[in-house]
A protein has these predicted regions:
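Catalytic alpha-helical scaffold of carbohydrate-active enzymes acting on polysaccharides/glycoconjugates
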Residues: 1-124
């Protein structure tokens, strides 16, 4: 027996959920992966990785917003609280345009399971 889905708009049989990750790392930190193919010596700041990690708030999210505006699509944007602190204009614009804002920790390098209960409460 074929199952019928009749509650999608216009009888459509497929829906797509657009989710954008708007992530930042703590100051001076970079993602654990890097566009660099050669490992840096211990203690050397990964300036390329840091710059790469800042691209999302400075350029990437604005490009996504233009695409979403042009296609009249709303998205769920998972963002770190630090991203909201660093890029408040972007977050205000996302909210004003009707995109859903979803909490996604404080920063990407903060891993809650590695914290004590007290440290976790402080973060929250």
């Amino acid at each position: 027996m074929e199952k019928s889905i009749s509650n999608w708009p216009d009888g459509r049989k497929l829906t797509v959920m657009v989710t954008i990750m708007f992530e930042v790392w703590s100051e001076g930190k970079a993602p654990p992966y890097s566009p660099m193919t050669t490992s840096l010596k211990s203690g050397t700041p990964d300036l390329l990785g840091i710059s790469w990690s800042q691209y999302g708030g400075k350029t990437g999210i604005w490009r996504f917003m233009r695409i979403l505006d042009d296609t009249d699509i709303n998205a769920t944007v998972c963002l770190n609280a630090k991203a909201a602190e660093l890029f408040p204009d972007a977050v205000k614009r996302l909210h004003a345009r009707g995109h859903e804002i979803a909490g996604h920790s404080y920063t990407q390098d903060l891993v809650l399971p590695y914290l004590t209960l007290e440290e976790e409460k402080d973060v929250i």
